[in-house]
């Protein structure tokens, strides 16, 4: 049902279906109602609407049936909720709901609040993943393996060290999120359609009532910009792209041709014709969805490009890509955490590869140099011995005992993993 455009007439089902955002607005519906309740209460506080009308509107908002609204044929959630209120309390009271606001500033506020809610859920998932990584890193602190550069066996590390490198990524991502969240915590309310409103709204007071920390200063920018969404989405996708490299490692290592990882039974499927197969389907799907997230980010950017300052309905099409990215991240982190908790690592095979493929050569060359031989001479000497098959290399256990902070030294791995686990015992983490 068209409400705002009813005075124009026309439209019809085709136009309504094509332009309606109701299917996407489910993501912000609760935030929209919360903002409206706070807005109406503020209007009553500053004395521009009758307090009785505000109370009646608030009661109607408490009773909103979201399923019924979704079937109402509306342009968007804002129109649907206002029509719901007016139908229940009449225009004499419900008609005040539209004062001092625009869909432009209100949807920008709802997107910010919904994004903050979803990021909070994501951060809880990240905390659980970090705990799983730390526990397994402690378990595999002494488990020697080759690292890989250029997908060739490289320097000897331990699987515990490898797991802590994922934890390091999560920590950096958490820092990046902490940097972008202040952008989301700035309120656009009171900006109106582009240049503010005549109603004497105290923007800072209204912002504080909703949990915002600041206001977006310029009204045109406040209601028409989606920079905050692009910034948050780009950070999340950057994390996912980096995470996909580890996902790909696990998929490769699950192959019996490499044989480092045995995936949990719950994460594998088999072939319809080859019953021996143990396909790591959860991580294959995650790998694909991370690529989809890159596409969503590109679409989010592209929708905003060249539409001019101020709100256009193009922006309605951008928001769904933000939600898709956050969903991919949240579900992916949960799946990876469950995988890490249940995987088995073949330390015997990994150690054998570290030995077989000269993964201790750099440490051996360093050890020779530290005994007084110039490093490059030691390097070429060892290279010649490897070529002849006569090299006497350090064992993987000897090689990983490096003195540097953050190294694969099992003691360093235990120190770092134990430090992480301390936080796992506190609800705040």
UniProtKB/Swiss-Prot annotation:
It catalyses: 2-(N(omega)-L-arginino)succinate = fumarate + L-arginine. GO terms for cellular component: cytosol. InterPro entries: Argininosuccinate_lyase (IPR009049), Fumarase/histidase_N (IPR024083), Fumarate_lyase_fam (IPR000362), Fumarate_lyase_N (IPR022761), L-Aspartase-like (IPR008948). It is found in: Cytoplasm. GO terms for biological process: arginine biosynthetic process via ornithine; L-arginine biosynthetic process. SUPFAM superfamilies: L-aspartase-like. Its EC number is 4.3.2.1. GO terms for molecular function: argininosuccinate lyase activity. Pathway: Amino-acid biosynthesis; L-arginine biosynthesis; L-arginine from L-ornithine and carbamoyl phosphate: step 3/3. It comes from the Archaea. Gene3D superfamilies: Fumarase/aspartase (C-terminal domain), Fumarase/aspartase (Central domain), Fumarase/aspartase (N-terminal domain). Keywords: Amino-acid biosynthesis, Arginine biosynthesis, Cytoplasm, Lyase. Belongs to the lyase 1 family. Argininosuccinate lyase subfamily. This is Argininosuccinate lyase. The gene is argH.
């Amino acid at each position: 049902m068209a409400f705002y455009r009813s005075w124009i007439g026309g439209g019809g089902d085709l136009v309504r279906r094509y332009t309606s955002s109701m299917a996407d607005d489910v993501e912000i519906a609760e935030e929209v109602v919360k903002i409206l309740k706070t807005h109406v209460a503020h209007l009553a506080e500053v004395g521009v609407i009758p307090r009785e009308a505000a109370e009646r509107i608030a009661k109607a908002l408490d009773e909103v049936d979201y399923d019924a609204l979704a079937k109402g044929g509306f342009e968007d959630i804002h129109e649907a909720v206002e029509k719901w209120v007016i139908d229940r309390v009449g225009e004499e009271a419900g008609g005040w709901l539209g004062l001092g606001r625009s869909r432009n500033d209100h949807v920008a506020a709802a997107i910010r609040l919904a994004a903050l809610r979803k990021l909070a859920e994501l951060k809880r998932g990240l905390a659980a993943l970090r705990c799983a990584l730390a526990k397994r890193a402690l378990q595999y602190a002494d488990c020697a393996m080759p690292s890989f550069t250029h997908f060739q066996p490289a320097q000897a590390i331990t699987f515990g060290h490898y797991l802590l490198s994922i934890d390091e990524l999560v920590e950096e991502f958490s820092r990046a999120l902490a940097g972008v969240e202040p952008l989301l915590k700035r309120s656009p309310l009171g900006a109106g359609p582009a240049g503010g409103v005549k109603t004497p709204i105290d923007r800072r007071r209204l912002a504080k009532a909703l949990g915002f920390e600041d206001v977006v200063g310029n009204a045109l920018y406040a209601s028409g910009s989606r920079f905050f969404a692009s910034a948050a989405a780009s950070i999340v996708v950057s994390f996912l792209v980096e995470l996909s490299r580890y996902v790909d490692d696990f998929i490769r290592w699950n192959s019996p041709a490499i044989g480092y990882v045995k995936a949990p039974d719950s994460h594998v499927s088999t072939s319809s014709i080859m019953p021996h197969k143990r396909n790591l389907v959860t991580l294959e799907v995650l790998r694909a969805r991370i690529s989809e997230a890159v596409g969503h980010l590109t679409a989010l950017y592209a929708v905003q490009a060249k539409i001019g300052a101020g709100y256009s309905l193009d922006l309605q099409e951008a928001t769904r890509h933000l939600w898709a990215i956050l969903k991919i991240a949240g579900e992916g982190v949960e799946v990876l955490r469950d995988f890490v908790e249940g995987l088995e690592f073949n330390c015997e095979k990994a150690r054998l590869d570290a030995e077989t493929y000269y993964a201790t050569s750099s440490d051996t060359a360093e050890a020779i140099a530290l005994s007084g031989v110039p490093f490059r001479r030691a390097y070429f000497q060892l290279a010649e011995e490897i070529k002849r098959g006569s090299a006497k290399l350090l064992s993987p256990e000897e090689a990983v005992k490096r003195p540097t902070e953050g190294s694969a030294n099992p003691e360093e791995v235990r120190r770092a993993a134990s430090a992480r686990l301390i936080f796992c015992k506190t609800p705040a983490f």
